[in-house]
Every structure is written in C-alpha cells, then in structure tokens.
Amino acid sequence: MAQSFTGKKRIRKSFGRIPEAVQMPNLIEVQRSSYEQFLQREVRAGERRDEGIEAVFKSVFPIKDFNERAVLEYVSYEFEEPKYDVEECVQRDMTYAAPLKVKLRLIVFETDEETGARSVKDIKEQDVYMGDIPLMTEKGTFIVNGTQRVIVSQMHRSPGVFFDHDKGKTHASGKLLFAARVIPYRGSWLDFEFDAKDIVYVRIDRRRKLPATTFLMALGMDGEEILSTFYETVPYEKKGDGWATPYKPERWRGVKPEFPLIDADTGEEIAPAGQKISARNAKKFADNGLKTLLLAPEALTGRYLAKDLVNFETGEIYAEAGDELDPTLLAALEEQGFTTLDVLDIDEVTVGAYIRNTLRVDKNTAREDALFDIYRVMRPGEPPTVEAAEAMFKSLFFDSERYDLSSVGRVKMNMRLELDCPDDVRVIRKEDVIAVLLTLVGLRDGRGEIDDIDNLGNRRVRSVGELLENQYRVGLLRMERAIKERMSSVDIDTVMPHDLINAKPAAAAVREFFGSSQLSQFMDQTNPLSEITHKRRLSALGPGGLTRERAGFEVRDVHPTHYGRICPIETPEGPNIGLINSLATHAVVNKYGFIESPYRRIRDGKTTDEVVYMSAMEEAKHVIAQANIKLENGEIVEDLVPGRINGEPSLLPKADVDLMDVSPKQVVSVAASLIPFLENDDANRALMGSNMQKQAVPLIQSDAPLVGTGMESIVAVDSGAVVVARRTGVVEQIDGTRIVVRATEETDPSKPGVDIYRLQKFQRSNTSTCINQRPLVRVGDKINAGDVIADGPSTELGELALGRNALVAFMPWNGYNFEDSILISERIVRDDVFTSIHIEEFEVMARDTKLGPEEITRDIPNVGEEALRNLDEAGIVAIGAEVQPGDILVGKVTPKGESPMTPEEKLLRAIFGEKASDVRDTSLRLPPGVSGTIVEVRVFNRHGVDKDERALAIERAEIDRLGKDRDDEFAILNRNMQGRLRQLLVGKTAVSGPKGLGRGEITAEKLEEIAPGLWWQIALDDEKAMGELEALRKQFDDARKRLDRRFEDKVDKLQRGDELPPGVMKMVKVFVAVKRKLQPGDKMAGRHGNKGVISKILPIEDMPYLEDGTSVDIVLNPLGVPSRMNVGQIFETHLGWAAAGLGKQVQRLLEDWQHGGQKQALIEHLRDVYGPDEELPDTEEELVELARNLSKGIPFATPVFDGAHIDDIENLLEKAGLDRSGQSYLYDGQSGERFKRPVTVGYIYMLKLHHLVDDKIHARSIGPYSLVTQQPLGGKAQFGGQRFGEMEVWALEAYGAAYTLQEMLTVKSDDVAGRTKVYESIVRGDDTFEAGIPESFNVLVKEMRSLGLNVELENS
C-alpha cells in the first residue's frame, strides 16, 4: 500500500493479524449526511426527495382561507449564499446561516353566484424570505452566536406496535397482565391492556380506560362481527338425544373429555370419558374414518353462541351472539325448533373467552354510544353531539395531519403483525387494530413472545436533520394559523404572497432549537477526540425521550443487540450512565434511523468480499461468526467456530455460519478503540480510560503514542484538527499562518489552479484550550490529495497525540504515591513536557447610558501611570504585554450622577474650575488567578461610530493580509496561465503581434524577449488556436475579476461596522494566553483508567535511575494495578520499553552511517523490525528523516482484540537487547544504592487532564454577599468563601473555643456592622473589634413576624 506524505516519515508497525474487510466510514458521517438530507441544498428544486424541509413544506401547504376563496401553494425553495463565512461568524459572534427563500403561489378563485362553480381568477407567484437556516460546517458543527455547537443524536422508542406485560407487579396474585401499545411518530398513543379479570380494555393517550369492544364498535363493527372476527365457529346439529359436530383432530389433541366420544355415523364409542387423547390417537381416529362426533347435550353447556337467534316473523330475540348456553336455554331453543346451532370455538385452554367477556361487560351496543363514550373520555365536561364525536374520533387516528405513524412505524407494524400494507399509509386502519388485538389475545393464550423494548430493533436514532425538521414543522404550523387569519381579513385580490407571510414563528422555532434545546450542546472542544465523540454521541434524554429519574436499570444496561452498533464501554459515570452512549466505530444509521453494523457474507464455509449492513431486526435471522476465526485462503479452518445466534454467544458448526464480523474493533467506539491492550483491562477501568482521553489537554509539544492502536491517524483526519490537502500539487509558499499549494493535476478551468490553506494560530477553543496549527511540509514538496500537510492541537505527524510518552517505574517511593498519587521528576517541568497553553477571553462593552455614553480611554481618574503602562493611546492593552491579576486590560469610564460634593472636591472645583469627578472607573481588569500574555485584541464598533487608532490599525493589518492572499493567488494564476500560453503559442505562426515579434513561426526564444503581459496581443493564422487563445484570455480575466471581487467584499465587510447588541457603541475582546506548567495537585492519567494526582515534584538527582544513569520521569504505585485489574498498562509499559530500546538502536546505526558506516545495516535492522513486506523510503533523504523520527522509539500499533501477544513483546525486548521480563534494576537517587529487586520500567503514554489545580484553588478576602442573609457567597465563580457549617461549629464547641466561634458566626460571616468595623480597625492598625447581631438572626425574627409572632429584643 502506498504510504501517505506523513506515513513515510514515521512507519507504525502493526501487530494486527486480521485484515480489515471494509473501510471505516467517515467518523462524523452521522451528522453530515443527516443534515444534507434535511437541507438537500445541492439538489435541484424539481428533483428533491420528499424528506427534510421539502417534506415539511409539502405537509403544511397548501393553506386555504376559511371560506376557500384563495389557496396558498408551495412551489419550491432555495438557499442564498451565507452573509458571512465560518471564520467571520466566530469572530463577530454571529450565526453561520443561509437565508431561505421559498417560492409560493397564491391562487384566487371566484365563484359564479348562479351555478356555484369555482374558477381561477388570478395566480401570483413570489419568492418569500422565510428566515435563516443555520448551516453545518465541514466539521459537523454549527456556529450559533459565535460559538461551536453540536446537535447530539437522540435514541427514542421506534414508532410501531409493542407487546409487553407488567411482570406480575400490578396484581397481588402475580398474574401476568398483557398489554399492547401503538406508538405513532406524532399523534395519540393507543393502548390495549388486560385487567386481572381477563377483560380487554383500551386507553387513548393514557386516559381513563374503556372496554376494547367500544373502540371496535366505534370503528363500525357490531357484536356479531366482533365475535366472528376473533373466534372460529363450530356448527352443532341435533341428532337424536345428542348434538353432532364435525371431528377436527387438532381440537382434541391433549384434551381429557368429560363424556365419551361417539361416532355419529356408526354409534360406536371412540374414546371413554376422563381419558386423555394423545396427538397420535387424535390423528389415528381421523385416519380410521371418523368424520362426525355425537356429543351429549351436557357438552354444549358453558359454550357461547356465535350468532343472534331471532324469530324473523315476530322479531322476538331468543338469544344473542355471545350468550352462554345452559340446559334451560338449550331446552328452550329446542322447543322453538332450532336444530342447528353455531357455537364459538372457545375451550378456555387454548382459546380464552376474553373478547366475548369484554363484549358482555361493555354497556354500548351501537356505534353512536361508543363514539359518545370515547368523546367523554377525551373531552370530559363537554356535551357530545354525533358530529363532534365523529370528527373527534376521526381526527385522533385517521387524519394524516394529526396522526402520523411514519414510514418507520408502518414498516415495524407490518413486520410485527405480519401485514402487507404500503409504507405510505401512515394512519391506523381497522385491520391494524384487529391484528393488534388478535396478537394480544394470542399472547394471553400462550402463543408468541412479548417484545423487548431495549432491543435496538425497537429503538431508533433521530439525528440532526430529523430533530430540526420536527422543530421547523412546529414553527410552520404556528405560522399557518396566522396566515389563515390574515387571508380572511385582507383584500385577497390585491395582496401578494409576502403580505400574508410573517416568517418570525418559523425563524424563532429554529433559533429556539439551536439555542435552548437539551440536544443542542456547547461542543466539547478540549481535544480532537472529545470533538469527534461528542458528534457521535447518542442520548436517550431530551424532548420526547427519557428522564434520568424515570430510567430504570434495563434501559441503561448493555443489550446483545448493541454488538457492533453501540459501544458497551464508553458511557459517562454518574446519573447518566447507560443513557448517553457512543456509536461503534463501523456503525452507520440507515434511512429509517436504525443502527446498522457491517458483516462479511460467508458462502459454503468460504468468506466473500461482499459486505452487508444489517440492523438488529435483520441480523436476528442469521448465524454470525466472530472476526478472529481462523481462515486459510478465505476458507474457515475449524469445524466449530465461536459466534452468535440471536445475540447469544455459542460454538457453531461452520456449515451454519452465513455472516462474520468485519473487524474486531467494530464492537467498540472510537475512544475505546484508541486504548491498546483494551482486551486486558477490566471494563470499569476501560470506561474511565475512554472518558479520560476526552479530557486530555493539548500540550505545547505532543508526542504520538509509542504504543498505539492504528486508529490515531483516522481520528486526527476525521476530526478536522489537521489540515488535509484537497488536491494533488506542489507546495509553492509557506509560513506559519498559511500554506500555498499549486495544483498539478489537470484542473477544472472554472476553478483556480491554486489552493491557499489558512492555518489557525493560537485560537481559543470552547474549553479555553489552544488551537494552533503547524505546517508539516516544505517548499517544493509534492503532495497528494488526502495527505496531511499541517498538524493541529493534540496531533503529531498527522496522528492523534493526546499526551506524552514518559519513562515510568512501578514502585513505592517514600509514601509519595500513596492512594494513586503520582511522583514526577523536575525534568518534566523544566523541559515543559506537560506544559499547556490556555487562552482566556475577556470582553468589555461601552454602552450608551442614561447619563451619557461610556468611553474606552486611557484617561482614567485616580489611576497612576504605572497601572496604564501596557495601554496604548486608545486605552487598550498592547499585544505581547505580560499581565498580572488586577492589571487593566481596557480602560473605560462611565458617567456618574451628580452626588453631594465633599469640601475637598469643592476646593478642587473652585481652583481648577472644571468637573473633576463626573466619571467613574469601570475598566476591564484581569481577574485573580489569571496571568499571562496578550495574544490578540479585537475591536468592534457600531456602524456610524468613529473608529479609534487601534481599531484602524487592526483593520489595516487584516486588509494587508487579504491583499497578500489575493496577490499570491494571482501570481500563481499568472504563472500557470503563462505556461499554458507558451504551450499554445510556440510552434504556431504569428500574423501580427506586439512590437519586437515579427510575422512567422513563434519560438520560445522570441517569446522570452517580449513581456508576458503582451503575449495576449499576438494574432495567429490558425483559427482554432485563436479560439483557444481567446478562451484562455476570458478565463484569465474572469479569474482576476473573481479574486478582486472577493477581496473587495471582504474589505467592505471589515470597514462596514459591526452588528452589536442594542445600546452597545463599542466592544473590545482581549485574549490572554496562560502557560500552565505541571504542578502538585494537577490530575494525570494513562489510557487504562489509571488516574492520579501529582503529589510531589522531585529533583532529578533524587529520582530513581537506571544502570546507565537515566532518571525515570514518573513513579507510579504498583498497588494501583492488581485490585483494579487494568493489566493493559503493564503490557503497554513493556512494549513501550521495547519500542524505545529499538529506537536507540536505530539512532546508533544512523550515526554510524552518517560517520562513514554502511547504510545497509540500518535498512536490515528496519527490515528485521518491520518484516519484509513493509515499504521503506526510496531516497536517502527520506530514509534519514524516517530514522531520525524513529530514534525516539519505534511506534507500534496493537489494535483492540487483535493486538500483540506476550511472546511478541518478549521477542521485541530481546531484539532491543533488554531483559525478556521487561524489568530492570533501579538505583536510589538519594543514597545511590541499588534497590533489592528488579522493577518494571518502561514507557507509558500519560495524559494531563483538564482538571488543573490552578482552576480549582481559590482564596477570598473581601467579596460579594448574599442579599437576604448577608452571608458570603460560595464557589470560585462568585468569588465566594468557605462555608463554616453545622459540624464545624460542633468541633469548635467541643474545643471550647468560644471567641473563635463567635467571630466565625458574626464578623467573619453576616454581622454587617461588625465586619465593617473590623475592616476599619485593621486599616487603623488596631486589632480590637466587637461582635454584634448576625443578620441571620434578623432574618429569623422577620420570618417569625411574618407568621404573626412578634419578637422584640430587650436590653438587659
């Protein structure tokens, strides 16, 4: 396989033995494809599928006015270009969105007064603006008000029908009560349920229950039809003293008759009473010619009539359908001359009389009564009329505007009920209700299985597109009402469509969804992995989902159908466990919203290249083998292979297997697949490991892991953190902020022949970490499309690099690694191994107040020159200034109202004759706990406000940058064009041309003598060539105009002024970069859930050291491994140790070669490590670069569940010249003595987590107080104090520390007068104070007074 540009520079040796059968899908495809389906932005208007926005418009339109004089129809929609690009939106705090224009057609009718016929009077079409729709960036995020947001996909119960029982919890007897529920996509829920007496009830929207037969009657069935639908009919004919009935063997299997069975034809006894009839005997009777049975009259007792028995002449009803036969009734019927009876086939064993009993309980007999009953339940208190009841019932389940099963619901319903109904029938039909009841009754009779609601076949994913579609529909429906009212109130003949439409409700619905929906989340931007996992998250919470409190254990648990779809490992710890999940690496979401997992087809024990994606429902029918089964030339070797059938793992014969997994890592999520030796870790720790990788802070210098899994490069590219080449080309120009690439493949004439990649420099992420991209290419490098050309945060050479490789020893050290503490070497701090940069953003606004405008200025009252040293003449801090807590970042003064003057102020006023104090200082100062360097300042001015010097300087710099981009692009375009012109002109015959070029053949030498700008003037005798010349010229002019237009647009936007909140004249944002070195109290972790807090930083000379004098970097506690069962970290240590040993050998061989040795020795060593199949670089320059990169350690990939074995690690340790045990003798840095036994030493990949002590530690002197209780606030954010609670008071009481207790409860807390006096006395240098009454006592007194109890304090 050809290696990528970065792949050549550092080759990762993989231990994977199982080839990948299918390429992993793009990791943020879920988000992108869903939103693309919603917008259908690239699809032409007439060709759009009926989904997304198109479906919403088609469902809401056409809109008719109340008297149907006019109708507003939807034609099509289109998006205009967004006003600002992504970068501009982030800087200006705008939403990245495109205006939506909808073409509507208003048709006005006129009615002929005589005939009443309608004819079209007028048709008007118009494009109407319908608000802005946010666009998704290439990274799968949205920019809303300048911040990156992610819409998390929601897991919810699929629409369809579900059968369940109460697990015996409802009734004291523990009897199972079955229930069926029809869940639509939108509309009323329909429940059918049994009660303890086996009567079937129906509930609509969980309201009061009614007998199920009431619902059937409302559907237009009568009692007789209901019974004939649910029960078979058995005919009985009077014969002598008994009743004859046809013999059916299946009815008598396993039955013990209470009376003898007699053959009606022969009169002989077939079977005696009380003897059980076996299935074999039942069949034998039929084979022997038994056709009709003669039963005693008692056999009919307890049976139910199937039809009404009526005397048609007199109209007298003798018995109704469903009546129970008893000897009296039977005798009466015989007397009336009934010789044949149709009886329901209910034997109370295999068929129960539940529907018949329900019909008996039901008071209603006619459809009208049933409709009234349903109306009373749905609208209690309203008197029902036939029309209202009919309309209400129809709108509940049979009106497509109110009720929608969705195509998913219909498909699920068809599958479960074995119906065959097209999936565009999205309302309930009578047949569906009957099928649901038949299935439910079958369950009660012991036939069939209940559904498992946690099966992924019954849960589906709603992604961005669908969530926004539902929200937009809500907005349009709100708008629909307003349109109808307006159509009726205006003169319909004169209005245009835009007069009828107010797009505010639709735009507000979209804004509300992105701004405040539970599923619209602030993107976790700590590092590239946290971004990617946030976009792949599946949440069961949110609108229409579960709540934390209601979700039980079953919903949260891992289900067999999660295999290959949802990761069983990655989920948060805490109340959300199991409710928030992550998509597995290879999983995709299908068009119905079900998660599918890929499998390879197996035919006759042989694997094929065919890969099929299956949902949980489809998979249930197949026998699936694991990915690690032994294969030889594609054929399964063993007769019994490990696999699963119906989710249950078992050993299966190879002949039965028809599918196999595509990869061992298809089970886990992206984060879990980044943990090497995951298979050797306990699941709880693996969970912590996956979650903590997402909290790793990007470091100044990252290392890719020596021991990786091969997923690192995929994550880096798919997350969008690195810059990937769009087209093949050559690097023309490069600096820290951009890369200019000239495309070399034949480019489309309409596209520029140059790509400019702007790099992000020191940008602030959502979590205040630093986003900084660094180029990896040099001028002249040839790159291919898809190559990584620049690294981003937490990446190195195009691979994810969340932390650093550190030399670790597992041993106790003077108690400093007690309870998972970590001891680190001073070298780590000195060399900035774990130093990170954090960028804090501060903003200040100058508003227009009632007393006058606030002003951003350097002229601040009562502030010395020292405090203003970093400010420029506009009062804004300079870039590069070092700032400390309390320093002024932006000087600002606010007008203050006239207050009485002190004598001193009056004197000043008299002397200087001007207002000395009409403004107060409201400058933006750096808060406590932050110090750093100013890296960026942005100034925003309201349109029409004069810009200060600083704003103009920033604007000039930005215009220069844009101009440079334009000029560079033009220069390359010019060079390209000259090359193409030269090719076209050389060898042709000139007819005329500029001065210096004679007629005749054009040669390269002649062309060189003429300025390239004049080549266009050459006229050729060849018409075809002349046509090409003209086409080139037009193309060149168009490209130049396009560049100029783009430049002018951007400059215009810069100079136009900014859209600021109301009342704000000017806004300044200041970005401060804070350098955070590692210090005691910071949290660190490995990738195996092995986390700890730094306890001490030890001088290098005191750290334990190896025999060659190398000090270890980190000392971890060995007791942290056995009980936690995350042995993966030990394997990683050994393999990392081998990697570093082999790297040293590469370095030695490289040095030998560079000092006159043999190149071959180095190549042979690399071949020995990588194996003969690995492709090594061709050129010496590339080989040297590779060897240099490998000298720190040879990187390995051990894919999850398919990684390195112990013997692999031991062999590599041996190759590296190290002990096969992976242990080494260490020496005590303090005494120089060797420790008694060898210690496990090696390289572990350590992460610094986003739990930094600087962000947590906090101290308060004087700060804000609570308004009512006057006690100090709590928490760092409020600059609060430490609470001295009840238990602490007991402690002081126990010590008898009365005075300390008194000051804690009064002057240090809520004694307002007392604390002011303390402050004054401290200022005076005095330390006496008096405690008064705490405010909380006054609050208590007031509370008592509010209850009518007067409390007065008496002086004693």
Curated annotation (Swiss-Prot):
Catalytic activity: RNA(n) + a ribonucleoside 5'-triphosphate = RNA(n+1) + diphosphate
CDD domains: RNA_pol_B_RPB2
One GO cellular component term noted in the UniProt record for this chain: DNA-directed RNA polymerase complex
EC assignment: 2.7.7.6
Cross-referenced InterPro entries: DNA-dir_RNA_pol_bsu_ext_1_sf, DNA-dir_RNA_pol_bsu_external_1, DNA-dir_RNA_pol_su2, DNA-dir_RNAP_su2_dom, DNA-dir_RNAP_su2_hyb_sf, RNA_pol_bsu_bac, RNA_pol_bsu_CS, RNA_pol_bsu_protrusion
The entry's keywords: DNA-directed RNA polymerase, Nucleotidyltransferase, Transcription, Transferase
Pfam families named among the record's database cross-references: RNA_pol_Rpb2_1, RNA_pol_Rpb2_2, RNA_pol_Rpb2_3, RNA_pol_Rpb2_45, RNA_pol_Rpb2_6, RNA_pol_Rpb2_7
One biological process term in Gene Ontology: DNA-templated transcription
One function term, GO molecular function aspect: DNA binding
Signal peptide region: none
Role description: DNA-dependent RNA polymerase catalyzes the transcription of DNA into RNA using the four ribonucleoside triphosphates as substrates.
Family under the similarity heading: Belongs to the RNA polymerase beta chain family.
Quaternary structure and partners: The RNAP catalytic core consists of 2 alpha, 1 beta, 1 beta' and 1 omega subunit. When a sigma factor is associated with the core the holoenzyme is formed, which can initiate transcription.
The protein, known as: DNA-directed RNA polymerase subunit beta
Taxonomic classification: Bacteria, Pseudomonadati, Pseudomonadota, Alphaproteobacteria, Caulobacterales
Gene: rpoB
